[in-house]
Amino acid sequence: MRPLSLKGHERALTRVRFNREGDLTFSCAKDKKPCVWYTENGERIGSYDGHNGAVWDIDVSWDTTKCVTASGDLTVKIWDAELGNCLYTINHQTPMKSCGFSYSGNLVCFTTQKMTKNLSTFQVRDLRDSSQMVEGGESFFYSQFDVNATTALFTQMDDLVTIGFESGLLQQYDLRNPDTPIHTNESVHRYSVQDLQLSPRGDFLISASRDKTAALLDVNDLKKLKQYKSERPVNSACISPNRDHICLGGGEDAMQVTQTSVSAGHFEAKIYHMVFEEEFARFKGHFGPINTMAWHPSGTIIATGGEDGYIRIQEFDEDYLGFTYDF
């Protein structure tokens, strides 16, 4: 592999994402400036200035015209992806933890943290309705939880959303009938769900958890299909767009890193066969746990973001591209 190492953040990465074509890489970290880069050469195009706290999540619309960020400064911001202008700001009483666009790019979802007397919430706003995009505006969909909702995403067009919780619970809601979840999975994870990502074709969902596992789920009913075990907590997992492979990233908890050798911390990204649940490759690079990862739409590149503040663009070599699994 021939990695590019990108240094544009002062603190630990929280999310990296590719746009639909894969020519741009979007990143955010525990500093206050989300960045956008050229994937091809690692050149930084610019940053989105306006947040005043750690930025926990970033997502980009299918046509790369808008991006959304969720921050610890109690705001979600929608940006003009090309010009970097802030289009809308949504305020809340507690920090925003995750965010995402729907398939059409017209709806934006986000989760908020549970804090003091405020419950954790999941909200959906419609960008086409300006009354929803102002402070105090009513949400298109609104739900409260006793347990922290840590991650959420749209899993089917603009209709279904899946939410992961600190307790390991997974729930799926239909926005057309929002009263109760249509599917629930309480058994797949024992600890916090750190990340949820959809397969490129939209038929599978992969969840990463602090219980040292990642799970492949049927997007229609959240039924567990496969489970991948690691030696350390899994912070992020992604699915290859053109092969039956998945990749896990994580490592020893960031609080323990100063007491951990690089080899014992399991800071490598690990590639598993999707069907056989067996690890067959891993790649190193980060000095500290991997917090986030994304598979490029071409299937030949993985981007990882670590606690060390670096983004690594890992391009696969011929050994991987020509690899066939013996079974």
Curated annotation (Swiss-Prot):
Record flagged with keyword Cell division: no
Keywords from the UniProt entry: Cytoplasm, Initiation factor, Protein biosynthesis, Repeat, WD repeat
Subcellular location: Cytoplasm
Keyword field contains Ligase: no
Coiled-coil residue windows: none
Chief place where the protein resides: cytoplasm
Effect of residue 252 to R: Represses the convulsive behavior due to cholinergic hyperexcitation caused by an acr-2 mutant
Highest taxon of source: Eukaryota
GO cellular component entries: eukaryotic 43S preinitiation complex; eukaryotic 48S preinitiation complex; eukaryotic translation initiation factor 3 complex, eIF3m
GO biological process per UniProt: cytoplasmic translational initiation; formation of cytoplasmic translation initiation complex
Recorded GO MF terms: RNA binding; translation initiation factor activity
PROSITE patterns per record: WD_REPEATS_1, WD_REPEATS_2, WD_REPEATS_REGION
Repeat (WD) residue spans along the chain: 8-49, 51-89, 188-227, 229-268, 285-324
InterPro entries associated with the record: eIF3i, WD40/YVTN_repeat-like_dom_sf, WD40_repeat_dom_sf, WD40_rpt
Function in brief: Component of the eukaryotic translation initiation factor 3 (eIF-3) complex, which is involved in protein synthesis of a specialized repertoire of mRNAs and, together with other initiation factors, stimulates binding of mRNA and methionyl-tRNAi to the 40S ribosome. The eIF-3 complex specifically targets and initiates translation of a subset of mRNAs involved in cell proliferation.
Recorded family membership: Belongs to the eIF-3 subunit I family.
Subunit (UniProt): Component of the eukaryotic translation initiation factor 3 (eIF-3) complex.
Protein name in UniProt: Eukaryotic translation initiation factor 3 subunit I
